[in-house]
C-alpha cells in the first residue's frame, strides 16, 4: 500500500513540474581567438577573468637551458651518461667494427655481379648486359644540335627556333668543341697541344 502511494506521488510531481525545453531563440556564444587570449593571457599566473576563484598554478620558474647544458647532459651518445639523471638506464651495445675503403672494395667489388662476401645469401641483381655504344652511335643519334633529330627517339621534342637562335650565339664554342674532340689526343695536356694556334688557323 505504501509503495503504491509513493509511486502515485512521484507521477503527480512529474506532471506538476514540466521538463524545461531550450529556448530556440537562444544562440550559444561563439568563441574567438581573442576570447582565448583574453581568458588565458598568461600560462604562468593563469589569471582567468571569467573564473576569478579558480585556483592559480603556483610553480617555480624553470631554469633557462643553454646549449652548454645540453652538451653537459648528453655529452656522449655511446655511453649516454646524464649527470641530471644518474639512474637512467644506459644503452648497452657492442662497438661497431671500423670500416675502411678496403672493406668497401672487398664487399662491393663488382656492381655487375654484386657478390658480397659479408652477405652471401643476398639476392643478386639479374639484368641483361647493355648494348655497347660507340662514338659512331652517338654521331648517328645526335647528328645535329640545332634540330636534335634522333632516329632512336623520333618522338622526342625537337628544339624550337628560339633554341636555334640561342645556339647560334654559342656557335664559336661548339666549333671549338668539335675541333678539340677531333684533333686533341686523349690524355694530352695543354703543354702538348697549342690549342689557340690551331683553333685560330
From Swiss-Prot:
Glycan attachment points: 187, 194
Signal peptide, first to last residue: 1-20
Alphabetic keyword roster: Cell cycle, Cleavage on pair of basic residues, Glycoprotein, Pheromone, Repeat, Secreted, Signal
Processing after translation: Proteolytically cleaved by kpr, probably at the C-terminal side of dibasic Lys-Arg residues. Glycosylated. Most of the precursor molecules are glycosylated on at least one site, but only a small proportion are glycosylated on both sites.
Propeptide: 21-31, 58-65, 92-99, 126-133, 160-201
Gene Ontology biological process terms in this record: cell-cell signaling; induction of conjugation upon nitrogen starvation; induction of conjugation with cellular fusion; positive regulation of pheromone response MAPK cascade; signal transduction involved in positive regulation of conjugation with cellular fusion
Keyword Signal recorded: yes
One GO CC annotation: extracellular region
One GO MF term attached to the UniProt entry: mating pheromone activity
Residue ranges of coiled coil: none
Locations listed in the record: Secreted
Free-text function comment from the UniProt entry: In h- cells under nutritional starvation, P-factor induces alteration of cell morphology toward mating, arrest of the cell cycle at the G1 phase prior to the initiation of DNA synthesis and indirect transcriptional activation of the sxa2 gene which down-regulates the signaling pathway.
Comment block on domains: The Pro-P-factor precursor carries 4 repetitive units. The second and fourth units generate the major form of the P-factor in the cell. The first and the third units encode slightly different peptides, the fate of which is unclear.
Protein's name in the database: Pro-P-factor
Gene that produces this protein: map2
Amino acid at each position: 500500500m505504501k509503495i503504491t502511494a509513493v509511486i502515485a506521488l512521484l507521477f503527480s510531481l512529474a506532471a506538476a513540474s514540466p521538463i524545461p525545453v531550450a529556448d530556440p531563440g537562444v544562440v550559444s556564444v561563439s568563441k574567438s581567438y581573442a576570447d582565448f587570449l583574453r581568458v588565458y593571457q598568461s600560462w604562468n599566473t593563469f589569471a582567468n577573468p571569467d573564473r576569478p576563484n579558480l585556483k592559480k598554478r603556483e610553480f617555480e620558474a624553470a631554469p633557462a637551458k643553454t646549449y652548454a647544458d645540453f652538451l653537459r647532459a648528453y655529452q656522449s651518445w655511446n655511453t649516454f651518461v646524464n649527470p641530471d639523471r644518474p639512474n637512467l638506464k644506459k644503452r648497452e651495445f657492442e662497438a661497431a667494427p671500423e670500416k675502411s675503403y678496403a672493406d668497401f672494395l672487398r664487399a662491393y667489388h663488382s656492381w655487375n655481379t654484386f657478390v658480397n662476401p659479408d652477405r652471401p645469401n643476398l639476392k643478386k641483381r639479374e639484368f641483361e648486359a647493355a648494348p655497347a655504344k660507340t662514338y659512331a652511335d652517338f654521331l648517328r643519334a645526335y647528328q645535329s644540335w640545332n634540330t636534335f633529330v634522333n632516329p632512336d627517339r623520333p618522338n622526342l621534342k625537337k628544339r624550337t627556333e628560339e633554341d636555334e637562335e640561342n645556339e647560334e650565339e654559342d656557335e664559336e664554342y661548339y666549333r671549338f668543341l668539335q675541333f678539340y674532340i677531333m684533333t686533341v689526343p686523349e690524355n694530352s695536356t695543354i703543354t702538348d697541344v697549342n690549342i689557340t694556334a690551331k683553333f685560330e688557323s
